[in-house]
Amino acid sequence: IKHKRKGIIMSKYVCSICGYIYDEEKENRKMGELGDSWSCPMCGVQKSLFDELVVEKIKKTNTSILVDKNNPAIEKIENKCNNCGACVEACEKLEGIHKKEEKQIICVYCGQCVQACKMDALIPKREAEKLEKAKKEGKVCIAYMAPAVRVAIGEAFGMEYGTFAQGKLVSALKQIGFEYVFDVTFGADLTVMEEASELIERLAQNQNLPMFTSCCPSWVKYAEIFYPEIMNHLSTCKSPIGMQGQMVKNYFCEKNNLDKNNVYTVAITPCTAKKYEIQKDDGTDLVLTVTEIIEIIKNRKIDFKNLPDSEFDKILGEGSGAGMIFGSTGGVMEATLRTAYYLLTNTDLEKDKIEFKAVRGMKNVREAEIKIKDTTLKVAIIHKMADAKKILEEVKNGTSKYHFIEVMNCEGGCIGGGGQPKLDETKAQELKQKRMQALYQKDKQDQIRCSYQNPEITALYQDYLGHPLSGKAKELLHRGRFLLSQNDS
């Protein structure tokens, strides 16, 4: 491939060892002008091992995904891309989206291409400047962190994989300039209350079953694109972050005499797709991924590893152990079943039965039968979209045997999100399980392990919402017509 620059023909050369592409036009320097000491930036070999690209070769090599400039979640730094194809492979293997067959760019914003990219050519969309702008405008900045964030962020600061760094992150966020720091497990508990109630209502009416979880925006986007016929099977509940944002902007601001127009809410997430979700659900003003927060902490030279542990602020403070396990595949299912059991029986689960271990694990599609009183619930858990097709086709065709299905886009659930620190791919499964185990361990240690037992949730319903599925709850915590992208251009 040749280009002209001021009468000079510019070429591209590919490293025969690692595939790195040297583009004379981008570098503004001919390959022949490079000194003998120059070496490949990727693998270090000499320039003599570079071959000039011809048309046929560039077609074979140009295998990176296209990222629309308006993509709300992911950005691509073109001059870092070496066309290795890892991003395409991730999208095809994990999502089942075959890029060569695309007639237009299809993206569910999950960021698994970001995780696969070794060159950092694909990154979560950087938006830290929006936080700085809000601070300069004198807004009250409020942060809330998702469960999976606290078991991954320590990895970037030399801590062991699976270290539970919640207290240190609260301290860091305060140093960054957040006036209040809340726990999204509170929003997860609220989601459980609404979702368990919705499931029981659907079971009683035998309507729109099976019910799918709806807190993963990449899964919702996938369903909208490939299975629009099943959208009425998705729970109408907003995600924990969606509910948390609404409660901060409404309940919390009202209780604390704050002007919600002068409050700036920031969700700290493992998930790139949340950047897309908040465009459709108001309440949260900004999403910063774990990798963005890591950059902010490092740029401010905060000694994260040696920070003291701080507590969350109260009134929308901490959640239960059930809210904590939302960050793991099967966690939403298990948390919802704990509360559904209580709502159906009016009795607490016995201590030795509170863990629904049948729904745990790393198998991409799992199923279980859960007996609650006279009801036997058939449930399924999916955490890799490429493996979801069989179950989704059954729901589409009206032949599904299930009552309740949890779907998470990323392997391992939120702990494997596109905005998390990258893992060595040869050890990824093992390291994801360490993150998951940290969440389950925190659940086991909590005094409150069921969402309905959280006193702050009880107070919220008594003071503000009334009861699950009330008119106010539906107005603030549910989507009337479930299409995240109904206003997409």
Question: What do the PLM-derived regions correspond to, one by one?
Answer:
Residues 72, 82, 108, 164-165, ...:
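Residue-level recognition of alpha-helix initiation/capping sites
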Residues 5, 124-489:
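Iron-sulfur-associated redox domains of electron-transfer enzymes in respiratory
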Residues 1-9:
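Short, Lys/Arg-enriched N-terminal segments with co-localized hydrophobic residues
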Residues 12, 18, 37, 46, ...:
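Non-ligating segments of multi-cofactor redox enzymes
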Residues 26-29, 55-56, 381-388:
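A short, sequence-level motif marking secondary-structure junctions
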